[in-house]
């Protein structure tokens, strides 16, 4: 372990010192540098000494062999040089050393020397590109080292496009082989000519260190500084020069010049003049102007200072002052050597002064003056394009687009790089059509297109915006969002593109991403009123009014614009109305109205009050509120339509038509207004007019982005289509309504998807909830269903007449018809009441038939079976059916019923008339036949003919009440007539009241009265429970729930009941009794009495969706009460032809035996 630690330390130390080791030059590198130095300075002794040592240290180094090769070649030893070249080819055939040496060897041949001479001739005659091509051909891509390399790159430097490359190569050669004065001389001149003065002086300073180059460096250096204008900079430059060079003619001249300049600069006026002139030459107008102004003040007739001042103003862009000073300079010294320069500058500044003044006039909306100035500029210089451009801008200001187009085109012919002309033409063509503008832009060069990149982006943005809007109208939100992203890339940070993108993402279901985009925008542009307004709209549009107001209030009120103020007013009004609506929904409508009436007069509030009055059928108050609106706004469509709807509700169709006719004719009516018109037309019976309105309105709503308005149009349009007899089209319209209301972002394409979307959602608003519910109701109304069910039930009793075991097999087919559903029903019923117990003689004397008068004998077992059929139809208002009791029973009758349902506000009611069988026993339901040993007569088959009224009150809140009152005449074959009145009522409280789960507890009460007690089974009796007094109270508890594919109900109740019966004759119809037995029959009776006690019920019902088309279910219930204890068990299967993936029924809805309707 210790050894390992030491090794790690050693390795770390080695790695740490490695860079320092590599940084230090090796002996070989130092000797090779001495070789190159000796070659550059033509010191062969230094070359030989270095090569001798190198060949001892590293004889096979390609660079060493190449150096020996060059040495031999310089000595004229061609054979020796060739041997070294051959050796180098073996050592490093791919090295630069070998390639360079091979080229050098070639140059020693006659052909090589001739080719080199030709290249040099081309270079000296000014054919630099041809010379470089010849060099490249000769060198084959590998220039030799030394003077030939300097010669090659000096020639390359004569090609302007490659000058920088050549300078860098010459600097490299100078660094590798310092001391080549010819190279340094040439390199310095190239650097100065390329305005790389500091680098040039650095080369000269290097050159001055050698005796061979010092004099040349001094001359070049002095030549670069001697003509500098007198200034501190020129003095500094001379001092720097004299610090490096100490002798020679240039030094003497520099010393004299330095003394003179120092003397001149001691004069403040001269110093200011000199510094100003120097600053002008350096392009430093800001520094030059105050210096030259001082000089001119000292000598107002100094034409050179005036001219320089004019030049300085020109550099600064101050055309007016430039013109004034240049004119003075020319007037003072018409023959100055600077006149040509001053005249040129004067012309330029007069031209641009006129252009500037023309632009200013155009900006001041004075096109006539602008035109004169641009024309004046054109007269000064008719070769420049900007005067013509200005005339084009004047034509644009006058909206003379043909003239503007001509001027801009002329501008481009004069100067294809004039981007303003390109922009002007692009704007003209954009006004004509986007396509023409895009075609023009496509014809431009790359540089011209770059100059109007913003216009091209804007055109692309407009095109993408149109495409996105088309996709939004089709409900293709994700695709629209992709285009909005492209728009945002063209215009990053755009408030309204970000808003549109966020809206599309929200509609596409990507709500988190949409929220993030808007939040980021708010952070980036926190003080931008447009951002605040857009984010406020976004939040309020997604039911976040309070958040919208909070965001708006983060902006100082002084920065609010009219849009923000209008939005705030609307949101505050919404909050007031929201509070009022909550009060109203909680049953405090009077308080809600009082609160609204305390608000400032508002059309919106008056319309709300009118709507509330209309809903509670207070038509007088509704009319008054609508009239208040019309007093302020006589053409208010909402108020006119409101009065129309009030008149329709009041049944005054003539007044309604009169109101509808007052509606202002306009092509700009909102979708909601048109929807209400169509509904009014339909309610007035103008079906054709309503059809035309909806036919025009529905396509408009489909083309709109999702909104409450378009969703309501499509919802009501679908209802109208269904009512008009086109339910198939109505279902298609409901699919569009789902998209418009935000139920889904994609229109459903199949029944499973469509019906799955009808499932309730706790997060839905009232509109989504209504669209789902209405679509589900119509779909199920149009579906074909087949249900097969088997029900077993029974109750214990006496064998032969009341020990009942019953089986009912039901088959029902439901199909759409008109606006309701028709059905066909068949029940196969088997009832078995057991067998009589016999005495030793095989007879029985039970209280059945006439057995108490004469012992009966014969068939002990009592049962019967038969099949009933029925047809019927029902919708939301009417329901009727007609059918039979089971055919095959002893007594068969036609039965049925009819009912009508409606509501009065929150109170629902149903009235009905009916003829129904009493099915609680075989005797009451199907009749029995007295023993053949006695009378053999049939009796029973009791039917209830009567009417009923049912009431219910349930506003969807926690409490509900129901009640039922009915009266019936009870008759049967050979049964004493009877009648009954029944009252039932109940209250329930919803402990849990959710869409898919409900738990209730309640209190029920029943009061029954039968005229006679005919519960016996003797001949003439009815065999049905018929107390003269019956009172019961029950406390039911119910749990109902559904999931995606299950639905169930579990219920139980505890009850207390009291009943009383009168003593009744056992044989109430003496005409049925043989004469010999009548005396005994008259003496017999069924004793009356009273009883009371407790009971219970338990019920479980379960249904499962197996597939979209198949459903199965089962149920069981157990009842135990005084004098009544039936129990049931059933199984059923239901088939849906169209398939159903919507909500499961809650609770499940098995078939009810037709006899129990």
Curated annotation (Swiss-Prot):
It comes from the Bacteria. Pathway: Glycan metabolism; bacterial cellulose biosynthesis. One of its GO terms (biological process) is cellulose biosynthetic process. Keywords: Cellulose biosynthesis, Repeat, Signal, TPR repeat. The keyword Signal applies. One of its GO terms (cellular component) is cell outer membrane. Residues 1-23 form the signal peptide. TPR repeats lie at residues 62-95, 112-145, 269-302, 303-336, 351-384, 385-418, 461-494, 603-636, 710-744. InterPro entries: BCSC_C, TPR-like_helical_dom_sf, TPR_rpt, Ycf3/AcsC/BcsC/TPR_MFPF. Pfam families: BCSC_C, TPR_16, TPR_19. Belongs to the AcsC/BcsC family. The genes bscA, bcsB, bcsZ and bcsC are constitutively transcribed but cellulose synthesis occurs only when DgcC, a putative transmembrane protein regulated by CsgD, is expressed. Cellulose production is abolished in E.coli K12. Required for maximal bacterial cellulose synthesis. This is Cellulose synthase operon protein C.
């Amino acid at each position: 372990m210790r050894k390992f630690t030491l090794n790690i330390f050693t390795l770390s130390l080695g790695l740490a010192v490695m860079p320092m080791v590599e940084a230090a030059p090796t002996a070989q590198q130092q000797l090779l540098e001495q070789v190159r130095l000796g070659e550059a300075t033509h010191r062969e002794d230094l070359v030989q000494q270095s090569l001798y040592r190198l060949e001892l240290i590293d004889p096979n180094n390609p660079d060493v062999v190449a150096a020996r090769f060059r040495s031999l070649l310089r000595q004229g030893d061609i054979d020796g040089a060739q041997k070294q070249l051959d050796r180098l080819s073996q050592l490093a055939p791919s090295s630069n050393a070998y390639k360079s040496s091979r080229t050098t060897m070639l140059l020693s041949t006659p052909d090589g020397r001739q080719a080199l001479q030709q290249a040099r001739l081309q270079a000296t005659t000014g054919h630099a590109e041809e010379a470089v091509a010849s060099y490249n051909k000769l060198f084959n891509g590998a220039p030799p080292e030394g003077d030939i390399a300097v010669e090659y790159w000096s020639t390359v430097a004569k090609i302007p496009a490659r000058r920088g490359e050549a300078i860098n190569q010459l600097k490299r050669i100078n660094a590798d082989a310092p001391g080549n004065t010819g190279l340094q001389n040439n390199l310095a001149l190239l650097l100065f000519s390329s305005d790389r003065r500091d680098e040039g002086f650095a080369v000269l300073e290097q050159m001055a260190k050698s005796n061979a180059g010092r004099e040349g460096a001094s001359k070049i250096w002095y030549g670069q500084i001697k003509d500098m204008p007198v200034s501190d900079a020129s003095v500094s430059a001379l001092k720097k020069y004299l610090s490096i060079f100490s002798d020679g003619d240039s030094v003497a001249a520099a010393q004299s010049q330095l003394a003179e300049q120092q003397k001149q600069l001691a004069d403040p006026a001269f110093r200011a003049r000199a510094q100003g002139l120097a600053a002008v030459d350096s392009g430093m107008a800001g520094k030059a102007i105050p210096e030259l102004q001082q000089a001119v003040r000292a000598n107002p007739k100094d034409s050179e200072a005036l001219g320089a001042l004019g030049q300085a103003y020109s550099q600064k862009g101050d055309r007016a002052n430039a013109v004034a000073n240049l004119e003075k300079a020319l007037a003072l010294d018409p023959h100055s050597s600077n006149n040509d320069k001053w005249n040129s500058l004067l012309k330029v500044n007069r031209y641009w002064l006129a252009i500037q003044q023309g632009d200013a006039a155009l900006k001041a909306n004075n096109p006539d003056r602008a035109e004169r100035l641009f024309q004046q500029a054109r007269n000064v210089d008719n070769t420049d394009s900007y005067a013509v451009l200005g005339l084009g801008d004047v034509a644009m200001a006058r909206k003379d687009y043909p003239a503007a187009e001509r001027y801009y085109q002329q501008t481009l012919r004069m100067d294809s790089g004039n981007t303003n002309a390109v922009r002007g033409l692009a704007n003209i063509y954009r006004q004509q059509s986007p396509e023409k503008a895009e075609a023009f832009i496509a014809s431009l060069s790359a540089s011209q297109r770059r100059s109007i990149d913003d216009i091209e982006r804007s055109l692309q943005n407009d095109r993408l915006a149109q495409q996105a809007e088309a996709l939004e109208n089709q409900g293709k939100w994700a695709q629209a969002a992709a285009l909005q992203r492209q728009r945002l890339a063209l215009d990053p940070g755009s408030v309204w593109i970000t808003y549109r993108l966020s809206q599309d993402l929200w509609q596409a279901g990507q709500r988190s991403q949409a929220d993030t985009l808007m939040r980021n925008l708010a952070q980036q542009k926190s003080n931008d009123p447009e951002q605040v307004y857009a984010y406020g709209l976004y939040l309020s549009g997604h039911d976040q009014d309070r958040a919208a107001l909070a965001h708006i209030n983060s902006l100082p009120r002084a920065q609010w614009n009219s849009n923000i103020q209008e939005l705030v007013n609307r949101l505050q009004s919404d909050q007031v109305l929201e509070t009022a609506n909550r009060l109203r929904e909680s049953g405090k409508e009077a308080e809600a109205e009082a609160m609204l009436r305390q608000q400032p007069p508002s059309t919106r509030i008056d319309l709300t009050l009118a709507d509330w009055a209309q809903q509670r059928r207070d038509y007088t108050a509704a009319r008054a509120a609508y009239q208040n609106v019309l007093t302020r706004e006589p053409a208010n469509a909402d108020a006119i339509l409101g009065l129309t709807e009030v008149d329709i509700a009041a049944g005054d169709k003539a007044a309604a038509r009169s109101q509808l006719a007052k509606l202002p004719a306009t092509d700009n009516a909102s979708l909601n207004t048109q929807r209400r018109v169509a509904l009014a037309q339909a309610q007035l019976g103008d079906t054709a007019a309503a059809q035309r309105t909806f036919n025009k309105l529905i396509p408009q709503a489909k083309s709109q982005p999702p909104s409450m308005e378009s969703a309501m149009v499509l919802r009501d349009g679908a209802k109208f289509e269904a009512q008009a007899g086109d339910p198939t089209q109505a279902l298609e319209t409901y699919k569009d309504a789902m998209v418009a209301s935000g139920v889904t972002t994609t229109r459903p394409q199949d029944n499973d998807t469509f019906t799955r979307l009808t499932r309730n959602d706790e997060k839905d608003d009232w509109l989504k909830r209504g669209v789902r519910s209405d679509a589900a109701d119509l779909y199920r109304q149009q579906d074909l269903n087949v249900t097969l069910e088997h029900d077993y039930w029974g109750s214990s009793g006496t064998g032969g007449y009341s020990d009942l075991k019953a089986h009912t097999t039901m088959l029902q087919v439901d199909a759409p018809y008109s606006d309701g559903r028709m059905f066909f029903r068949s029940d196969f019923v088997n009832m078995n009441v057991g067998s009589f117990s016999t005495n030793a003689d095989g007879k029985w004397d039970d209280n059945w038939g006439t057995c108490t008068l004469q012992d009966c004998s014969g068939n002990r077992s009592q049962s019967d079976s038969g099949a009933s059929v029925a047809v019927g139809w029902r919708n939301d208002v009417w329901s009727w059916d007609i059918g039979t009791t089971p055919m095959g029973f002893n007594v068969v009758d036609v039965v049925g019923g009819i009912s009508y349902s409606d509501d009065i506000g929150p109170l629902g009611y149903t009235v009905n008339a009916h003829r129904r069988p009493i099915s609680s026993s075989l005797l009451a339901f199907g009749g029995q036949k007295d023993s053949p040993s006695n009378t053999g007569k049939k009796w029973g088959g009791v039917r209830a003919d009567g009417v009923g009224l049912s009431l219910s009150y349930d506003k969807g809140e926690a409490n509900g009440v129901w009640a039922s009152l009915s009266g019936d005449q009870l008759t049967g074959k050979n049964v004493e007539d009877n009648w009954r009145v029944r009252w039932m009522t109940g209250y329930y409280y919803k402990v849990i009241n959710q869409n898919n789960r409900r738990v209730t507890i309640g209190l029920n009460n029943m009061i029954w009265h039968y005229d006679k007690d005919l519960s016996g089974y003797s001949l003439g009796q009815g065999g049905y429970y018929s107390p003269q007094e019956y009172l019961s109270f029950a406390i039911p508890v119910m749990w109902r729930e559904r999931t995606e594919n299950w639905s169930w109900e579990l219920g139980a109740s505890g009850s207390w009941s009291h009943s009383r019966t009168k003593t009744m004759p056992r044989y109430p119809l003496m005409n049925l009794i043989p004469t010999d037995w009548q005396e005994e029959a008259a003496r017999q009776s069924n004793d009356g009495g009273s009883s009371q006690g407790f009971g219970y019920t338990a019920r479980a019902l379960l249904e499962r969706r197996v597939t979209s088309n198949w459903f199965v279910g089962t149920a069981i219930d157990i009842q135990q009460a005084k004098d009544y204890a039936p129990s049931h068990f059933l199984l059923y299967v239901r088939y849906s032809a169209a398939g159903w993936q919507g909500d499961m029924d809650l609770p499940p809805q098995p078939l009810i035996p037709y006899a129990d309707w």
